[in-house]
Amino acid sequence: MPPEQGPVVLGIETSCDETGVGLVRNGTLLGEALSTSMDQHARYGGVVPEIAARAHVQALVPCVRAALSSAGLFVADIGAVAVTAGPGLATALHVGVAAAKAYATALDVPLYGVHHLAGHLAADLVDGEPLPDPLIALIVSGGHTSLLRVGDLARDPITHLGDTLDDAAGECFDKVARVLGLPYPGGPAVDRAAVGHDATALAFPRPLTGRADAPYTFSFSGLKTAVARWVESHPDSPVPAGDVIASFQEAVVDVLTAKAVRACLDHGIGDLLIVGGVAANSRLRALAASRCEQTGIRLRIPARRRCTDNGVMIAALGDLLVRAGAEPSPAELTAMPGAFLERAQLGTALPALHAA
């Protein structure tokens, strides 16, 4: 392989219930594989960490082999390893980090521990153009809801404009779906059940959207409670269940898109990136597209298959770090279940250019 092509980066994702593997070189996707233990968690109504960890142990090596096979490569062709070091379920993260360290050590190649949410920001780099610098990013998933200002993803610190005070948007979807008797996972179930129904049937609250509220901060626990109370107090309501679901969904995506667009306008930034599992929601995608078109903002959302957790996004981020000349993570890299998003890479000191 000519050196100018760069190394093949193996990406490993095991932060929750998906075992994801990707192979990327110089921005090009070479191979991928994905395994999920979602069905094993459905009976419990949520992810069970021990079950997820066991599933990762069983699926990780077969996924690496499948990705290599699809790329026509051998394990010896791997030139660097990137792995989600956090945040996520501790037991699940440990499986991925241990495997990544083993591959890096056995192959004598550099190891890059990366932040799971930064991986989402890099999710469609293999499908599209490089990310604009700067941009406003809205991360919406089961565990996180944040508005960010992002510069050079591989080099610059990430600025939080606002985060959720309580439930993340995806968590709210799951909890309300349970109240409404929808199957797990709740996000896709709500999306499907709302199709063709009246999203204006019920006026559920839009939390933290008043003039005196923090403009980029989110809160969804009150909305969740409002839906639950409405359902409890209207057992014989003539309002179709689909209208209730659509009205709830509209409240969530209205808040998300309004705050994201406002952040772009307030900061004079013309590019909005929406990522995370909830970014697969059809109504969120449609409303974001409409509002961005009205305000002249360029919208970027990954393909639905790239919104949920996967190894390609981790490989793409690792590849970006390699090409930016980032220092590898130390051999002592460990899982960081509660890692806060400040930079794309975890487990390293700040670069010299940011030193005092």
Curated annotation (Swiss-Prot):
Q: What is its main location?
A: cytoplasm
Per the entry, which co-factors are needed? Fe(2+)
GO BP term, pick one: tRNA threonylcarbamoyladenosine modification
Q: Which Pfam families match?
A: TsaD
Co-factor: note: Binds 1 Fe(2+) ion per subunit.
Q: Which InterPro entries match?
A: ATPase_NBD, Gcp-like_dom, KAE1/TsaD, Peptidase_M22_CS, TsaD
Q: Which GO terms describe its cellular component?
A: cytoplasm
Molecular function via GO: iron ion binding; N(6)-L-threonylcarbamoyladenine synthase activity
Residues involved in substrate binding: I139, V140, S141, G142, G143, D174, G187, D191, N281
- Which compartments is it annotated to reside in? Cytoplasm
Q: State its Enzyme Commission number(s).
A: 2.3.1.234
**Any keyword Transferase?**
yes
Q: Which PROSITE patterns match?
A: GLYCOPROTEASE (PS01016)
Q: Reaction catalysed by this chain?
A: L-threonylcarbamoyladenylate + adenosine(37) in tRNA = N(6)-L-threonylcarbamoyladenosine(37) in tRNA + AMP + H(+)
Keywords attached to this Swiss-Prot or TrEMBL record, sorted alphabetically, are: Acyltransferase, Cytoplasm, Iron, Metal-binding, Transferase, tRNA processing
Residues reported in the UniProt entry to bind Fe cation:
H116, H120, D309
Family note: Belongs to the KAE1 / TsaD family.
Per the entry, what this protein does is: Required for the formation of a threonylcarbamoyl group on adenosine at position 37 (t(6)A37) in tRNAs that read codons beginning with adenine. Is involved in the transfer of the threonylcarbamoyl moiety of threonylcarbamoyl-AMP (TC-AMP) to the N6 group of A37, together with TsaE and TsaB. TsaD likely plays a direct catalytic role in this reaction.
Protein name stated in the entry: tRNA N6-adenosine threonylcarbamoyltransferase
Q: Which organism is it from?
A: Frankia casuarinae (strain DSM 45818 / CECT 9043 / HFP020203 / CcI3)
Which gene carries the instructions for this protein? Answer: tsaD
